[in-house]
Amino acid sequence: MKPIHTEPAATGISAHCQVPGPRSIPFSSLAGVRVGNVQDDAAATGVTVYRLTSPGRAAVVVLGGGPASRETESIAPERNHPLNALVFSGGSAYGLAASGGVARCLEDHGVGYDTGIAVVPIVCQSCIYDLGFGSASLRPDERMGYAACKATFSSNDPRSGNVGAGTGATVGKAAGMRQAQKAGIGYAAAQMGSLQLGVAVVLNSFGDIYADGKKIAGMLTPDRSDFADSYLSTLQSAEENLFTSTTNTTLAAVFTNGDFTPAQLKHLAQMASAGFARCIVPAFTTADGDTVYAISVGPDKDKVAASLDAVGALSAKLTEEAIADAVYSAQVH
């Protein structure tokens, strides 16, 4: 499934927004987080692990109607358990098994909360629904989760496109998979002084994708020769039960060395979600499980005081960048 607008991948914040100060940096240069991927290309599914090098404060907002998640209550502001790793995967709710492998890998490396009896890692996870693109019976499991986590101890691999959790991602599914297009996982990062900010997006939406007001991927006509319109299709089905299943979901994670409380991080995640609304039409539907995390990485002594509003505004722009990257980096199918 080939995007009709085959522009090059987004090259950084300067390509898509006019914000003075921030400069684009590689996601791999972010301090405090390491990325590992494992995928089954034949089954078109996979796992991406974001391992924090120090336990981090985190928060999450769920904006879609059908999330598949693990341990999100443990990072609620009123609980504030330090996070050790975030997992994105395919497989829908079946894919949650991958976190068991991540937790076991972290335990093997002595990472987690020491209860005095055992080390217990805090691992959050969210999944996309990719069962309709590849194999519905082969899903991410504990073995894949362990391997993806293990990779973070020897390398740092934030590749874009059809890798890890983005292997089976698609967009524009208002008329089903036959008129959908391929997407994947995308990244964008920026630095202002000593403040670093990066966004990862696994793009697997019901809706169409826009960049700078132009549609770049989404629902196609039945003969796949041009774009159709998911928004109009949704309106035309207003009296029908269009959303018969929650077979989509876009995931995002904001990583920053900014010194924010869990409550502030939740607000940061909400501000970052504006990037979804700008790029995905329609967004946050009952057919999606859209979920956004915000995580403060690195040791507390190294965190940077920063304006929540400024970081939130920039995170929304970087979310737009990461969404475009997820489209332009996707393989042609």
Whereabouts are the PLM-identified features?
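A structural signal for small-residue-enriched, beta-sheet-centric alpha/beta enzyme cores
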Residues: 2-93, 97, 108-333
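Active-site-adjacent structural elements in enzyme catalytic domains
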Residues: 101-106
